[in-house]
Amino acid sequence: MSQALPETLESRLTEAFGTDAVGKLSVPGSGVVAVVLAYNEALRFPYFLEHYRALGISHFIIVDNASSDGTRALLKGMADVSVIPTDKPYRDHKSEWRQLLCERYLQERWVIFPDVDELFVYPGWPERPIGDLTDYLDTNGYRALFCPMVDMYPGGPLKNVSYRPGQSFLDACPWFDGSGYRLAPLKGSHRKRYKTPARHVFGGARERLFHHNSKRPGTWVDNFVLKTFFSLKSPMPKTRFGRLADHLLFKLVKNALPDTAAVQSKIPLIRWGSGYKFSGGVHGIAQEIPVAPVWGALLHFKYLDDFQSKVSEALERRQHTDNAGHYREYDAQMALLMKRGPFDGGSTRFTGMESLLSCGLVRGKLRRKHRSATREH
């Protein structure tokens, strides 16, 4: 009895996407490429593309997951965009789609993985192109950039938001939480299964608005430990022993924190290596790889005109984590958000990179002459 031939990359691509066209893309041989998964994003795509083109992205590979709002027609004919249509379930294939595309087209290339409601910014933005950033990363041997996700929102009720395609997202949602974050290890088995990064960001507007349940009240000891060891400005552990000590120390305070804690960070810019495996989203990867001490940020624009319809859509499709668990939280608070909005007295207005640097949501800077970076202290 003859042995079956090993599964080829092309056949895996065809199976994952449901089309053999995915193996025939024309992707430039240089520059940073964006790999984007999208569903019904016609509202955001015009400005999203404008922003990332201004950064210097050379090409966009966009997986259109059966959009029905004109997204595909909007993207048609753009020379720097390759669209892969698929109706396969997002929840079952999101990691595989990204990984297979990189294995096929982007080995040892810099790849960015933004959602369409995310704007990537970094030290030196908007003056410095993304090529300066990847030059720094290459020169210093780093293979990934860590980025907090910063939820952006309007200064009033969501019912008053009026956004039009092509307008800057920041015109509609210029506010964010400048405090209330922590930099901590993951709980449970994910900490062992996904080694990069060593810590993740939690907190911010999402936790303030939606996550208040904890196993016990916090104490002054909890506050001291969190402020001293797990603030945004605390260092990442760099050794196996450091990670273990980090885990044991965090166990002292974890029961005083919300049981449901959304990860508010990603590693969206990666020099792709063979076999890399995502943790579902772009929050972490299984392999331990060198991550730069410099941080960028992903400005996250969920609260536009379509927020309510997007939540209803997500609840109906159930394609997101935990059967759209986060969207159930949004839905439970919808009336209050539409009436009052996420803004509160501690909100900070985004006026440029200094807004993020000053509160620890971005680290470092790019030097103009040598294309290298130094750590902000």
What spans do the regions from the language model cover?
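Catalytic-site signature of metal-activated, phosphate-bearing donor transferases
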Residues: 2-8, 124-377
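Active-site-proximal specificity loops/subdomain of glycosyltransferases
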Residues: 12-13, 70-113, 121-127
